[in-house]
């Protein structure tokens, strides 16, 4: 396996933990900051808002070298998560989560292009799947680890760990990922030509509904399990592993079905 693909997968792993770890630590954050769990849910929304703003902003940097864009995106992830780890109040943590979300969608887009270009002939899909595997590992191991850290140490340690992982990823992207040629620049308007066909709208709609359904329950999974279902706080880590395993199986099954 090429080291460059491993470096890219490191990035998706860090972003996956940054995105989903808040679900497992929501009660700890709410208690520490003196806010309700529904208000703490805003931190999940702030990350999602960052994703929405960050991906389109990539259009402004479409003429920059792809490796340079990846490094900047990792730097944003580091800053956002370190900011979150030191947040003294609701507003600073909200800002940290928003900044953490900015590189998410853009990184997956750029890293997919880079992975495809680094792949051997006829193996671009395999290369992209290796890159995306970081997200799978995040759901299966990273998020439960973050939940366990928050239970035993502090929720701040979880975000600090993600920030440190971002530093490691930044180094290996700089070291292992070569400069690759970007896609042909079709101009700002050219980026949206695909929306003239109905198929992309169907895909976007299905994705929005699917993710909306998942986040409705997964965002508040910890209080639902402890306060409604009666599970102990100590069992949450194991249950998060089980949820992550379900996501892995779902990805594998849907991949074969498609």
Which residues does each PLM region occupy?
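Extracytoplasmic
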Residues: 4-40, 55, 217-222
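Short hydrophobic/small-residue motifs within alpha-helical transmembrane segments
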Residues: 47-49, 136-137, 241-245
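Short hydrophobic/alpha-helical segments at membrane-entry points of transmembrane helices
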Residues: 89-97, 202-203
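Helix-loop-helix hairpin linking two adjacent transmembrane segments in secondary transporters
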Residues: 90-92, 121-122, 126-175, 220, ...
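Cytoplasmic helix-loop-helix junction between adjacent transmembrane helices
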Residues: 96-134
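Juxtamembrane intracellular "pre-TM" segments in multi-pass secondary transporters
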Residues: 176-204
């Amino acid at each position: 396996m090429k080291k460059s693909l491993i470096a890219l997968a490191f990035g998706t792993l860090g972003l996956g933990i940054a995105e989903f770890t808040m679900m497992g630590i929501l009660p700890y954050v709410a208690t520490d900051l003196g806010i309700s769990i529904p208000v703490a849910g805003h931190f999940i929304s702030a990350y999602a808002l960052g994703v929405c703003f960050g991906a389109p902003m990539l259009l402004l940097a479409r003429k920059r070298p792809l490796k340079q864009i990846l490094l900047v995106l990792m730097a944003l992830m580091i800053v956002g998560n370190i900011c979150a780890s030191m947040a003294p109040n609701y507003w600073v943590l909200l800002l940290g989560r928003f900044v953490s979300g900015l590189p998410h969608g853009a990184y997956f887009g750029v890293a997919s292009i880079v992975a495809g270009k680094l792949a051997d002939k006829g193996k671009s899909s395999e290369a992209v799947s290796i890159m995306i595997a970081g997200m799978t590992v995040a759901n299966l191991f990273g998020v439960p680890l973050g939940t366990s850290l928050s239970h035993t140490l502090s929720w701040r340690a979880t975000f600090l760990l993600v920030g440190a992982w971002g530093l490691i990823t930044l180094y290996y992207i700089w070291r292992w990922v070569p400069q690759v040629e970007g896609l042909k620049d079709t101009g700002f308007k050219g980026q949206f030509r695909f929306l003239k066909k109905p198929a992309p709208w169907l895909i976007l709609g299905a994705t929005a509904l699917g993710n909306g359904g998942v986040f409705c329950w997964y965002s508040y999974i910890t209080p639902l399990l402890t306060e409604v279902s009666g599970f102990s706080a100590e069992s949450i880590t194991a249950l998060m592993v089980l949820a992550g395993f379900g996501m892995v199986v779902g990805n594998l099954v849907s991949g074969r079905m498609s």
